[in-house]
């Protein structure tokens, strides 16, 4: 396939942005819903709340590529997991397949979906798509300062900028 300059430029932009942290949803909403599908830099991702922790996985089951975000949070051997809606494969917060109901054998370590770094800060779930990134979530010292007024909202919005530019309004 021949890529146009625009497609190439978008892909290069997305690739360059993967090393940064991106705000994706409110922590409060995630704790309530447990599963939130998002698209970040062209990747379909499912944001999860498992074992009291945030997690982000590629939104695709390794079996028949069903969307994990259409599945449900379940328990397997006492641990939270996301279970695929199609054949019930279960994944932990690191993307490792931990249960295949149709077989009683040990599951290969190679059956896993990509996972991404997550962090909760300022009431927001942040995701970084690059595991080798050294970037940090922007410091907002005013967040805990009572002299400032907080306006807590989080609407789904498509942006074509990074979080620092959003914060600064540029």
Predicted regions and their residues:
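Hydrophobic ligand-binding cavity/cleft-lining segments
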Residues: 146-170
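Residues at structural and domain junctions
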Residues: 10, 104, 152-153
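Zn-dependent metallo-beta-lactamase
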Residues: 1-41
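Rieske [2Fe-2S] iron-sulfur-binding domain
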Residues: 26-148
């Amino acid at each position: 396939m021949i890529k146009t300059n625009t497609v190439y430029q978008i892909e290069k932009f997305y690739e360059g942005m993967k090393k940064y942290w991106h705000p994706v949803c409110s922590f409060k909403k995630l704790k309530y819903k447990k599963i939130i599908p998002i698209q970040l830099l062209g990747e379909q991702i499912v944001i999860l709340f498992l074992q009291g922790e945030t997690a982000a996985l590629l939104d695709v089951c390794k079996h028949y590529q069903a969307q994990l975000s259409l599945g449900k949070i379940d328990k397997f051997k006492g641990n939270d997991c996301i279970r695929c809606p199609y054949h019930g494969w279960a994944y932990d917060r690191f993307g490792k397949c931990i249960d295949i109901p149709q077989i009683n054998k040990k599951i290969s370590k190679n059956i896993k979906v990509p996972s991404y770094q997550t962090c909760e800060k300022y009431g927001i779930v942040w995701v970084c798509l690059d595991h080798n990134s050294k970037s940090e979530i922007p410091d907002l010292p005013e967040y805990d300062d009572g002299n400032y007024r907080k306006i807590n909202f989080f609407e789904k919005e498509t942006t074509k900028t990074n979080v620092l530019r959003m914060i600064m309004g540029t």
